[in-house]
Structures are given as C-alpha cells and as structure tokens.
Amino acid sequence: MATKKTFLVLLGLFFITAGFLLFGNGVGAETLKLQVSNVITKVELLPLDNIEGTVLLPLVRDGTFVLETGELGSMKFIGTAYNMVGKGGSFSGYLVYIFGDGSTIVTSLAGTFWADPEGKLAGLQKGSGELINGAGRFKGIKGTLTMTGKLLKTIKGEIGSKTYNEVILDYTLSP
C-alpha cells in the first residue's frame, strides 16, 4: 500500500513539474492585430538607366497604429521600393513599432504592390517579414508579420501615397 501511495505521489510531482517546465515560462504564441496609417515623409526618385519607366525609391514612411485593444502607437518604415510606373513593383525594408509605454518591435518587411484593378485606389499591397528585435514588454520577441494594404491616390502637393494597412504579428517572447 505504501508503495502505491509513493508511486502516485511521484507521478503527481512529475506532472506538476512537467506543467511548470512546459507552460510556466510564459512562452505561449500570441497575436497582435494592428490597423496602420502612414505617409511618405522622405523619398528620392532614382530612375534606372536604360529601363524606361522604372525607378528605385529609397523612402521613409511615418505613421500611427491602433491595436484591437484600442492602444495607440507610432511606426516608421525605412526601405526601398522598386517601381515600374503604372504596373506596380516591390518593396523591402525595416519597420519600428513604438508603443505608448516605450516598448518597441523591430521587423523586416518585403512585399509587392500593384495597380488597383477597379481604379478606386492608387494600388494594393501585400507583404511579410520577421520580428527581429523588441524592447520593454516585447524584449525577446520572435515571430512573423503579415500585411495587406491600400495605397490612396495622391493629392496635389503630396510626395507619395498615404497607405492604410492591416498588420498581424504572430510572436513568442523568450524569457
């Protein structure tokens, strides 16, 4: 009888220990959904010689985001776009999301954009990337980013289109 009780106690301790090791470190997958609005604040137009209508655009985009929870923050994209005028192109660079408490998430981002087939917008875009660094409550972050977006038609005097993006960050935090 004592052997059976000892076995049950040891078995219970095993499951409790396993539970702490697997779930007690706070490393569970999480998701953040952001609605982002941004505008080009800096751009340089570099026509590619011998390829008519094609330009390389080093650029900076600044904007704001809101989470599903209502939390607000700001963002900055620094990157390059390759554009075949009127046909679309590709982009790549880095994003920094800055939260109200000072926490940050840094991501890579690459994607494509194309003309809106309905002609209502300047274009549509889709991209993805990796979460590569975090600070504050996002220290130790790793994960992925997916993004879909709409490029608004430019208004006279604007240096580039405003965008509205829906972004999903799937991540884990290392202890």
Where are these regions (language model features)?
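Bacterial N-terminal signal peptides that target proteins for export
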Residues: A2-G12
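Beta-strand-enriched cores of mature, soluble protein domains
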Residues: G26-P175
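Bacterial N-terminal signal peptides
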Residues: L10-L22
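Generic N-terminal leader/processing signal
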Residues: A2-T3, F23, T31
